[in-house]
């Protein structure tokens, strides 16, 4: 499969890229730091620069891709949540997702899947038991961030009947 990945140098993306390459998939990584990525990642991975916010030369690869895995986002545990840091956390998810959704909308042969990885923090504090998709949302900054992130994906809900996640 031809898979486009954002956030491929992060906590989830790094190990995932290794597995995808080992499984024989063609990987195109969109990254803010191409030189750093090239020095650390498998040479089979095609690396394309991306500012994480707007469409760029990478959009040509969306046409004909089988899937887009959007793992990009400011580290939520890396710094204190000041007003500026909260804007970075939200913007890194929402702006990039909007650019990806727009590029998918323009593709002649659209990917079958767009996967956005969010976190269990959406559900707030859970004292006991398991958390499933139908669990009530939390009332926190992370819950609101995920709401905005889902909203950025929502245009695809009307164009792709395979979209499984609805607005919370």
Predicted regions and their residues:
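N-terminal Rossmann NAD(P)H-binding glycine-rich loop of SDR-like oxidoreductase domains
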Residues: 3-23
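SDR active-site strand-loop-helix element
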Residues: 6, 30, 71-72, 114-120, ...
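Conserved glycine-rich Rossmann-like NAD(P)H-binding loop of the short-chain dehydrogenase/reductase
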Residues: 25-32
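Residues at the starts of beta-strands that form the adenosine-phosphate
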Residues: 2, 26, 113, 162
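Rossmann-fold NAD(P)-dependent oxidoreductase module
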Residues: 15, 19, 103, 152
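Active-site Tyr-X1-5-Lys
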Residues: 139-166
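NAD(P)H-binding glycine-rich loop region in Rossmannoid oxidoreductase-like domains
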Residues: 35, 39-99
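Conserved Rossmann-fold NAD(P)-dependent oxidoreductase catalytic core, especially the SDR/UDP-sugar
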Residues: 86-88, 97-140
């Amino acid at each position: 499969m031809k898979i486009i990945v954002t956030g491929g140098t992060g906590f989830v993306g790094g190990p995932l890229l290794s597995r995808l390459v080992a499984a024989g998939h063609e990987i195109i990584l969109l990254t803010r730091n191409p030189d750093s990525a090239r020095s650390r990642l498998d040479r089979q991975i095609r690396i394309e620069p991306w500012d994480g916010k707007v469409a760029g030369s990478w959009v040509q690869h969306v046409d004909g891709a089988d899937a887009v895995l959007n793992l990009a986002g400011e580290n939520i545990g890396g710094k204190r949540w000041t007003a500026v840091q909260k804007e970075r956390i939200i913007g890194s998810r929402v702006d990039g997702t909007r650019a990806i959704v727009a590029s998918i909308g323009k593709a002649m042969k659209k990917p079958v899947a767009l996967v956005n990885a969010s976190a269990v923090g959406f559900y707030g504090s859970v004292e006991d038991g398991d958390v499933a998709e139908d669990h009530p949302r939390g009332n926190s900054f992370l819950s609101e961030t995920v709401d905005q992130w889902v909203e950025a994906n929502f245009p695809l809900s009307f164009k792709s009947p395979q979209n499984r996640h609805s607005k919370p």
